[in-house]
Amino acid sequence: MALKRRDFLLFLGASVGTVAAGCFPSTGKKSSMPFTNTASDTKAVESGLSFQPVRGPLPLATDGLELTKQVKDFNEYEVKDDLVLPEGFAYDVIAAWGDKVGDSRFGYNNDYLSFVETGKDEGLLTVNFEYISSKPWLQTYEQVIGKSLPFAEIDKALKPVGKSGIDAFNLPDNNPTKANIREVSKEALIDLGMGVISIRREADGKWVRTNSQADRRITGISGLEDGRYLKATGPAVAVFRKKGKGYDDKLGDRIIGTFSNCAGGTTPWGTVFSGEENFQSYVPEQVNPDGTPLPPTKRLFVKDEEEIGGLGNVFGLAGNKYGWMVEVDPANPNDYGTKHTWLGRYRHEAVGIRVEAGKRLAFYSGCDRRSGHIYKFVSKGTVKNPKDKANSRLLQNGMLYAAKFNPDGTGRWIALKADTPVNPDLPSIHAGGIINLPKRPEGGIFKAEKDEQAIAFKKQFKTLGDLYTGNPQEKQGAILIDAHLAANAAGATCTARPEDTEIAPDGSLFITFTSGTPSSSDGGPDLRIFQGQDGKAYEYGWIVRLVEDGNNPAAMSFRWKKLALGGEPAEGGAGFANPDNLLIDKAGNVWMVNDMSSDKLNAAIPQGRLDKEGKPMSQSELRGVFGNNAIWFIPTSGPNAGNAYMFGYGPMECETTGPFFTADEQTLFLAVQHPGELHGLRKGGASGYEDRKISLRTPDGQEFLQTRRVPIGSNWPNKTANAPPKPAVVAIRRSDAQPITTAKLS
């Protein structure tokens, strides 16, 4: 048994010997493994995998090849511009960018998926639309949507100012540049937000759309022209309504749209939560001490092949109304979303929802930024019936906490409220050597780069209430609006880009941290907690298991374990980098997708792995070895427990996101996001490919040079020459109509 596999099983809390022998409790109760529900659930997978793993570009210990043959067998490799699945599996495209949805269209860069069943073989699929990939969107918009936009005119207007952008908000209404920017921004924001589509499974196993009354879009401009405003609850509403120091959009607590919708979660009562993540790309993130937003001029409109940003500028969107968790009831065609402000405003990724009768409601979420925190909301009231839609009202009163991880494996929750002491961690303990704090009295960010600055800040401000202004309700609202900086000031632990937060059947929380390297703007994680074997920043990511004391969702302290699964097999890794979304099947197995940056996918790596200056390449630069972003399966029982197997990989330059099983586990819904993000539409002929030399290592450390044939750009999902790449949602199924998770290899 490899050390990495042993570490994984111990991380789950199971005896390695017990798992290897296949000896599980026969009582029908939960076993010691937190993902496992019952002995009968595990029985189906004890004898083997349910699929033949896809062969990726990197030799793995699980390939079944002798090490001496791996160099020969992996000397050449061709990447496919397709969603590649095991033999015996198929996928059907359910919806793609530009398809009609209600009175709008299917948006761009689909992410989180949620399927709420409404009857046998039918239900409502809720889809997030996160952001615009500039190059393919600009290149193919007219081809896909069927109309042109004034891109050339905007480029001409941008030429004198370059990347600094245009303040369209303050241009006269009759200015043609303002009109052009408004038109493009409107179309881009229509492609963001959320969508609900009704679907049905046919007798042959394929899923088709049924176009019910529930089908609708909630876009980035909902409410602007159609009156479909989003609502809000909680303390920040008092800030939205006040006449304060900052910019006023004159809408009170009404909110125009939702965007940057990344991952999310689904409640037992049938509603869906969507996290607004990188909203700072479109509106100002920073706020004043009273929680009111900075003016739209702080986030200008920009457009080039790398970014279309500042989309909220021309419409005067208020920045403090974005960065929230949005709840939608997909079955209610008149529900266009509610932002629950007690859950905090930050760059939300996913949400882990813990609902138990007789206990308080707990929501866990991570801020997906370098130095972001883990948060927990605990309701004031208790749950009576987990399936009662009235549980949504429990989100209107409670408290938001941020996690403090201690190096000894313990931790505590810090309340983000006015009387919480100011006690920031020092810049010197963080990767990157900085920590951002609330700037006072001006508002915005103060970057502390020296320990003395953080110490002086603590002496100047005693409590969070000293940093924010207003009456008690407004002050609490301002703290929630400025949650990231407030958590920094209170001493919450800066982490390593937290992604998914998943609740296991035993109540423990699993968190994926996708990258431990810092940035110049946000800094990085606490190196006492998040470090590689050399004590330095670690790129490939971790999974953390957090257990509340007393297994109580309202506990104020916890225990935690961390496991570095990512990396090359030669270095003890499982063969992937940057873990992202997790999914747990009924048998307790772990399904995972990863999120490597598009510019790192299949990147060339020279023999010897030295950069142009003759220095060893960084972990980030070495990510080309892993190929495309992929879907991984990690069994937690049976003879293969703890090993990682590739279930599939996505088309070129994409990320696979939002995995979600139907209740019978015969279908895996998956979102394919941003195919062709780096190079756009793939051209036909020889120009559509490159042969790249990539230095690989066998699991025992032998270096060799692979010739990898790499398609440049994408034509997925049509897969015909010069077809536009389109984000799309697919349904994956076995050709024999058996469950994906438990059927055995024949």
Predicted regions and their residues:
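N-terminal secretory signal peptides
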Residues: M1-D7, A14
